[in-house]
Regions:
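ATP-dependent carboxylate activation and anion-phosphoryl transfer catalytic cores
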Residues: 3-175
Length: 175
């Protein structure tokens, strides 16, 4: 339990020892293309905006990655997503749990686009406008090694802010 300054309580159930990961995808209502899967470095329960993350995942097995892909595709289709979707997961003992799904562009899409040298926002925009379907694009992500997303904190400019990381985002940006 985390007491918020506005006197509301945020109850957040979590899985002890879970690894957090997230997937971003483009969906045209029928077909889904996973643009990237990132593994968080901080423990599950730290806000995704405050967590370092690795693209592609460094410690997730093929079974887990396939479950993430399957869940992402099913959720995107079930929500009738046309455009981008971000789905966050908790993984414990190779079992994948869904934390949340956001049918919108997430803060990780520009990071993935830059890492893979693919204009995913342009593709998604064309899909949303009905100009193209997912199958119309020739996706060819290129990368070598790993890309790391790192949060930027401005605690020195806001000295009275609680610095303890948790389910509410504290960072002011990412690099």
């Amino acid at each position: 339990m985390y007491k918020r300054q506005d006197n509301n309580l945020l109850l957040d159930h979590y899985l002890d020892g879970a690894i957090e990961a997230e997937a971003d995808a483009i969906c045209d209502g029928e077909d889904v293309y996973i643009i990237g899967i990132m593994e968080h470095i901080e423990p599950c329960g730290i806000h995704s905006g405050d967590s370092n993350a690795c693209l592609p995942p460094f410690n997730l097995g093929d079974l887990v990655i396939q479950q993430i892909k399957d869940h992402t595709k099913k959720i995107a289709k079930a929500l009738n997503t046309v455009g981008l979707i971000n789905v966050q997961f908790a993984i414990v003992n190779d079992k994948v749990y869904i934390i949340e799904a956001n049918p919108r562009a997430s803060r990780t899409v520009p990071f993935i686009s830059k890492a893979y040298k693919e204009p995913y926002v342009n593709y998604a925009t064309k899909v949303m406008l009905g100009v193209n379907k997912v199958k119309d694009f020739d996706f060819k992500p290129t990368y070598k090694g790993y890309a790391i997303k790192e949060p930027v904190f401005s605690f020195s400019k806001f000295p009275n802010v609680n610095k303890k990381l948790g389910p509410e985002m504290k960072s002011t940006g990412e690099s």
